[in-house]
Regions:
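Small-residue hinge/turn detector
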Residues: 52-64
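Glycosyltransferase-associated regions of secretory-pathway enzymes
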Residues: 1-51, 67-168
């Protein structure tokens, strides 16, 4: 059921990480979380916005690695796996921009980590469909950055070790 590009990426995971188990979160799994934001995003077929929330719930509740399915792995990332907390990476958001932010397509977290919990709790207090009918299409890297800034994150392309989150 996956496009060729995704099949190639998933095959790279199995090749590079043969000791890992891949967990695919389904529509039914997302609905079972019981989060209004997820349910509203799903109801209007905005899958990526529902997935933004599911990824933080998954890593908070189960621990592990979150990767978008279009990530191709060349080598292992063991050195970035935190004993506790969350690890993610800086990224430049727009070509030519000096502003950088936090990567949401690939991050690692211990079960119960405070950072993923706080991001998930942010979404639990929000509606995807606003009272006026418009959609809250704020992408998760902005939410991550806002929460990380409260922990001391500065938008610079440099390694930062903060309370509960390491940014590389």
């Amino acid at each position: 059921p996956y496009p060729l590009e995704i099949k190639i990426c998933l095959a790279s995971w199995k090749r590079v990480l043969p000791d890992y188990t891949v967990r695919v979160w389904t529509y039914e799994d997302a609905k079972a979380i019981g989060c209004k934001y997820i349910d509203q995003a799903l109801s209007v077929r905005k899958w990526a916005f529902a997935a933004d929330v599911v990824r933080f719930y998954a890593v908070y509740k189960e621990g592990g690695v979150y990767m978008d399915s279009d990530i191709y792995l060349h080598k292992r990332f063991d050195r970035f796996i935190p004993e506790t907390g969350c690890a993610t990476f800086n990224e430049r958001w727009e070509e030519g921009e000096t502003e950088s932010g936090i990567q949401a397509a690939f991050f690692i977290g211990s079960k119960g980590n405070d950072f993923c919990k706080e991001v998930f709790e942010y979404y639990q207090t929000r509606d995807f469909i606003r009272p006026d009918g418009s959609l809250d299409q704020t992408v998760s890297p902005y939410i991550m950055r806002s929460i990380a800034e409260r922990r001391g994150y500065v938008c610079k392309e440099e390694e930062q070790h903060l309370k509960g989150i390491d940014v590389y």
